[in-house]
Amino acid sequence: MKRQKRDKLTRAHSKGYQAGISGRSKDICPFQQNDARSEWLGGWREAVEDRHVGLSVK
């Protein structure tokens, strides 16, 4: 059975969240395309909010 590839925008959001929750800067966004960059930054913002609320991954 073939493993289905995840949507690139979903992956960008997930990677942004991972970067944000680990405390990295939003300036390290690896995406150049506006859609993917927007999703990455959205994930990053969500993670930063979660960190401020007290949720963290160690």
Swiss-Prot record:
GO terms for biological process: regulation of translation. It comes from the Bacteria. Its main location: cytoplasm. Residues 1-25 are annotated as: Disordered. The keyword Transmembrane does not apply. Residues 1-14 have a biased composition (Basic residues). This is Ribosome modulation factor. It comes from Alteromonas naphthalenivorans.
